Amino acid sequence: METESAAASGESFTSVTSKKTRKRRAAEERPMDTGEQPSKRPDFPPISGDKLMGDKDEMRKVPVPSHRYTPLKENWMKIFTPIVEHLQLQVRFNLKTRNVEIKTCKETTDVGALTKATDFVRAFILGFQVEDALALVRLDDLFLESFEVTDVKPLKGDHLSRAIGRIAGKGGKTKFTIENVTRTRIVLADSKIHILGSFQNIKMARTAICNLILGSPPSKVYGNIRAVASRAADRF
């Protein structure tokens, strides 16, 4: 009798499952989503050059010192042509302010054209040949670096003159050798030194010039830069 009542009461029991078990079963029964998931990062189409620059035209001014007026006048067409035809910019020489003014226009499509043209004109004003400065327009990995002899070593009077003479060499031989080995262009303007080239080549030329200023003999400097240049060539 007691066993029958226990059996009857046992039929009314319900099994209780935990919350974790219910979640796991629901996840197993749910079909696996193998479709392409939408990316969380926004995907915007590239903006064209004219929209990026906006309606307002940008302008840069490059000051021209008095000793560069004549070279600028003689080489004006060589400077004017690539800026207008290749970079699609407007350029003029303001006689009142003595500045070369470069301006964007409706035809300008390249966002970096204004910077390239400014670097090109600035390189010519510093003393580089038009053909050498034009490389700044054609190539993207070229830079200009300027420093003074006194930045390396505080020299004065005859000591400063001798340091500049060591950099130039007899008939410009030392300067030409550094240019050829490091594939750079160097301008010596009084105590200022301007180097045009790629980042790695500028570094090699700058190291050689600094060693000459600090008093190293040219023969030792030649050997060092040739060794560095050959290692760089083997690396690439």
From Swiss-Prot:
**Which top-rank group of organisms is this from?**
Eukaryota
List the Pfam families hit by this protein, alphabetically.
KH_KRR1_1st, KH_PNO1_2nd
- KH domain spans which residues? 152-209
Residue numbers spanned by region Disordered: 1-59
List residues traversing the bilayer.
Answer: none
Question: Any idea which UniProt keywords this protein has?
Answer: Nucleus, RNA-binding
Compartments annotated for it: namely: Nucleus, Nucleolus
Q: Where is the composition biased (Basic and acidic residues)?
A: 26-43
Its BP terms in the Gene Ontology are: ribosomal small subunit biogenesis
Q: What's one GO MF term for it?
A: RNA binding
Q: Which CDD domains match?
A: KH-I_PNO1_rpt1, KH-I_PNO1_rpt2
One Gene Ontology cellular component = small-subunit processome
Q: What role is this protein assigned?
A: Part of the small subunit (SSU) processome, first precursor of the small eukaryotic ribosomal subunit. During the assembly of the SSU processome in the nucleolus, many ribosome biogenesis factors, an RNA chaperone and ribosomal proteins associate with the nascent pre-rRNA and work in concert to generate RNA folding, modifications, rearrangements and cleavage as well as targeted degradation of pre-ribosomal RNA by the RNA exosome. Positively regulates dimethylation of two adjacent adenosines in the loop of a conserved hairpin near the 3'-end of 18S rRNA.
Family stated for the protein in its record:
Belongs to the PNO1 family.
Subunit structure, interactors included: Part of the small subunit (SSU) processome, composed of more than 70 proteins and the RNA chaperone small nucleolar RNA (snoRNA) U3.
What's this protein's name? RNA-binding protein PNO1
Source organism (scientific name):
Xenopus tropicalis
Originating gene: pno1
